[in-house]
Structure formats: C-alpha cells, structure tokens
Amino acid sequence: MTVLKPSHWRVLAELADGLPQHVSQLAREADMKPQQLNGFWQQMPAHIRGLLRQHDGYWRLVRPLAVFDAEGLRDLGERSGFQTALKHECASSNDEILELARIAPDKAHKTICVTHLQSKGRGRQGRKWSHRLGECLMFSFGWAFDRPQYELGSLSPVAALACRRALGCLGLETQIKWPNDLVVGRDKLGGILIETVRAGGKTVAVVGIGINFVLPKEVENAASVQSLFQTASRRGNADAAVLLETLLAELGAVLEQYAEEGFAPFLNEYETANRDHGKAVLLLRDGETVCEGTVKGVDGRGVLHLETAEGEQTVVSGEISLRPDNRSVSVPKRPDSERFLLLEGGNSRLKWAWVENGTFATVGSAPYRDLSPLGAEWAEKADGNVRIVGCAVCGESKKAQVKEQLARKIEWLPSSAQALGIRNHYRHPEEHGSDRWFNALGSRRFSRNACVVVSCGTAVTVDALTDDGHYLGGTIMPGFHLMKESLAVRTANLNRPAGKRYPFPTTTGNAVASGMMDAVCGSIMMMHGRLKEKNGAGKPVDVIITGGGAAKVAEALPPAFLAENTVRVADNLVIHGLLNLIAAEGGESEHA
C-alpha cells in the first residue's frame, strides 16, 4: 500500500493533531538531523505532503489526521478498558479481530485493532471501504455475548446509536440511516460492519467502524468530523484521539447494557435518531427497487417496519439498501411562459440560475460531491416549460452527475465561431473552453468598450475582446491554489503558511503570496496594454473580472491603473453570457 518506514509513522503521529512541533523533536522521532527532514518529508504520500506548513523552526499540518502512535493508543485503551493493537497497514482490521476470536474468544473481547490503511477494507453488502491515509478513523473490536447469533440482530443499530451518542458528546449532531450508517442529511459520515464467530460457547461479535475524520476528496456525498466540528463553531480542530476515546467509552457502556437488557431500552432513542422515520423511502437490492413505503419504525429485533400500498411489511437488513423516496415531492405549477435553468459546470463547483422573464430569479451553487440542492430545487421549481441550458468544462463524468439530478435534457453549449455579433478568432473553436467564450458574451452586459475579460478559478484566464466584436483569444495560467500547491509539492523549502501581499515582501510566505498575485495582475496588465495598442489611441479598454478571487485581484491592481481604467467585478459572468444568448434567440438582448 505504501513504502512508509516506522520513522515516517512516528513523525506523522507527532504532527497528526495539527499543532506546531519543533523540528528538533521531529528529527529525534525520525532519527536524523533536522536539516534532513525536508528530504524525508518528500517521501510522504502526495496528499500528505501538501498539508505541511513551516514557520520559525516549527512544523504543523493545516488539518489534523487520524494517525496514532502505539504508546498513546495503549494509554487511551487502558483508560477505556480495552486492549489495543495498532496496525499501520493491514488487509482488514475486522479480519485481525476475527482471527483472534477464532483462536481465543476471551482475548478478543474488548480488544481493539486500529489501522491507518486497509487493502481489503469492506462495508455492508461487500462494498469496498475507500479511504486515503489519515482521512478516516478505522478500528474493529470484539465483544463476547452469552447469546446465540440469531439474537444479535439489533446489535448493528445499537452500535450506531452508541457512536451517535459519542459524537453528540463532542457537540456534533448526526443521524442514523437504518440500520447503522451515521449520516448528516444525505451525506455519509461513517459506517459499521458486524461479523460474528461462534467459539467456546460464546458469540463473538466483531464490530468494524469507519468514520470520516477529514472530508475524503475522492468520495461523493460524504461528511466528516472535522467539517462538522467547524460547522458547530468549535474552537481549534477535532482530535482523533479524543474522538476514539469518546467512542470507546460510549460503546463500552451501551454494549454492557445491551448484553443485559437487549434493544428495548434504546428503541425510543433510535426512533429519534432515525433520519427516515415517518418518511417515504425506497428499498433497493443490487440497485433495483424491491419495495417502497413509509418508515413506521424499528422493533426490538432491529427489524424495519414499512407501511406500503399492500399493508405493513417488515425488512431485515441483509442485502437491502435504503434510500429516501424523492419522487413524492409535489411540484408547484408555474405560469405557461418559458423559463430557463442555466448551468455553469466549472472544474470544482456547479453554479445554476433560474431565469424568469429575462432576469435571475434564484442563483445557487454546490460542489459535485453533493448536488442534492440542485435536485431539491428542480423538484420544487420545475414544470413542463423549463428549458435547461448550460456551459461546462468539468468533464463528462461530472456532467453525468448533473444529469442525474435533472429529469430533462440538458443543452450543453460549446464555443462557436460567432454569436451575438462577436467573432471568435480561436483557431479551432471546438477546442476553445466554453467558459471563456460565454465569459466574453457575458461581458457585453457590463461594457460595450474593448475589454480584458478575466476569470479567476482553478485556472486564471485573461482574454481580449475588441469594441467592434472580435474575440482575439487570450492566456491561461494556474489559479492561486494550483500555484501554491505546485510550490508546496515541487520544492523543498516553499511549503510555508499562507502569507499576505506586500510591495516588498520580507518573509517567504509573504513572498509567495505577493508573487502569485503579481503574476495574475501582471498578466492582466500585459493583455490590457496589448489590446489598448491594437484598439487604437484614445479608445478605452475596460477590465471585467469574475470568479472567486475577483475582488482581491481588482484590489491588488496598481492605483494608477485603477484611476486610468474602468475595472469591474462581475459575478456569474458565464451565466450572463448564457442569458444573453438565449435572450437573443427570443429577439431580446441584455445591454450594459
């Protein structure tokens, strides 16, 4: 899985809480000289390397990680009444405890195995548990019951309830999706897999738990402890050791009670925690709907009760998955006039705007990992007169995600050779980023002069448009995040805390921040000078800036430049371009 050595794991454990650590201490953990640490750090996985910040001899990570050291884990386990084992890498933490349970069931009881990486981690229904180092808190433990296996059907929801209690102790509000998923709305925070072994006259339940500690970059519809911690306005960062100790305390107390009294004492609490109680749901097997109805509740065996068209039905977990039934949302009627839903598919986020009578009615956005707000708005606002028109540079897979939320054809518009009286001089218009084209079309909402059109996103684009309607092309450069990331990953000494912009920076962090902004501002001013020369003496050339960093870029341009030229910050420029185009189709056009 990785080629990390014990010294790498020790250093990671020292830094995992996100607090500053002096290089002398880290060097002792790595058994090397402090000046060797930078080269040593380059051996870390790429997603870990970029988290490091250095300042005045101290190292820290910009976010905490779920990484432990054996001694600290042992102390934590003793306080909670558990024996501990730490496996930096293994096939499956459940397999580790299952093997122990088969050999010595008494030893498996209250023995916990924590792992940082699993090659064969799994969830319910054989699904693979995906994770990267440090993103997920993963552990398994054994619990011996003096009961046969068939009497433990409610253990799964009880374990989920214990985890929810623990998270509540830390101020984090969660729900449970039957039978045992920890969720925040539609986003999954964690899952539980329980496997059992019958040995020595006892049933040993092996409880495997995985909780997203930081938001997993490659997993859609996910929540994390760290993001919840910040949403709850808690000071500082979440701590994986505190989280694990709180979980073990609640799991121990709840399972002790469950072993004596069963599920009955927990039923009311579970009903409150159940996200879908009283709501319409679909039950799926292998992706196919096998049943639909309204959740009535869960009984003492952990069995789900549904009210269906055929009457009440009961469902055991097995190979069944539960999903909210969004088809039941009523759709309000709208006037018969044509309405539009305009989409801008950027690299990292989707933006959309509802257009009625030629104006924006509602504007929204969401990351691709959770487009449910778009789906919810579609269910609420759509009718038979809505036409969906979009521009996308995000790739086919993300466009497919958008399509899943909208029950209608999407007209994805490419760049064209000409539109709205503007001629596109790009050599191959089909290769031209459609966002750049619609930014140019949208700029006519704000200026009829020649203008430099700037978009600050994942990439920064700087394009030229003449006053007589010739789009001349332009430049593309990395955005601020990509510039910072490339310095962090590709250099030994420039992975520093974010600095501030100064005329004459005297620290490395400030030099990096100032250099990145100067690069963008310099590119804008270079393009402005070229366009002004081409446009002719005495004729104005405006600057239109859009995107997340637009205001900061406008502020950073030299005062003399701002005094001599018109510089405007325009939100949603692509959507303005789409609106201009469809308005022209209807005989109207937006003007400045």
Curated annotation (Swiss-Prot):
Which superkingdom, per the lineage?
Answer: Bacteria
Q: Which GO terms describe its cellular component?
A: cytoplasm
Q: Name one Pfam family in it.
A: BPL_LplA_LipB
Give positions of region: Biotin--protein ligase.
1-329
Please give the chief subcellular localization of this protein: cytoplasm
Q: Which CDD domains is this protein grouped with?
A: ASKHA_NBD_PanK-III, BPL
Per the record, the GO terms for biological process are:
coenzyme A biosynthetic process; protein modification process
Active site: which residues?
A: 435
Binding sites annotated in the UniProt record for substrate:
426, 433-436, 508
> Which is one GO molecular function term here?
biotin--[biotin carboxyl-carrier protein] ligase activity
The metabolic or biological pathway listed in the UniProt record of this protein is: Cofactor biosynthesis; coenzyme A biosynthesis; CoA from (R)-pantothenate: step 1/5
Q: In the Enzyme Commission scheme, what number(s) does this protein have?
A: 6.3.4.15, 2.7.1.33
Any idea where the BPL/LPL catalytic domain is? 83-259
Q: Which catalysed reactions does the entry list for this protein? A: biotin + L-lysyl-[protein] + ATP = N(6)-biotinyl-L-lysyl-[protein] + AMP + diphosphate + H(+); (R)-pantothenate + ATP = (R)-4'-phosphopantothenate + ADP + H(+)
Q: Which cofactor does the UniProt annotation name?
A: NH4(+); K(+)
- Biological role stated in the UniProt entry: Activates biotin to form biotinyl-5'-adenylate and transfers the biotin moiety to biotin-accepting proteins. Catalyzes the phosphorylation of pantothenate (Pan), the first step in CoA biosynthesis.
HAMAP family in alphabetical order: Pantothen_kinase_3
- Matching NCBIfam families: baf (TIGR00671), birA_ligase (TIGR00121), PRK13325.1 (NF009862)
The Swiss-Prot or TrEMBL record describes its family as follows: In the N-terminal section; belongs to the biotin--protein ligase family. In the C-terminal section; belongs to the type III pantothenate kinase family.
Which protein, by its recorded name, is this?
Bifunctional enzyme BirA/CoaX
Organismal lineage: Bacteria, Pseudomonadati, Pseudomonadota, Betaproteobacteria, Neisseriales
Gene from which the chain derives: birA/coaX
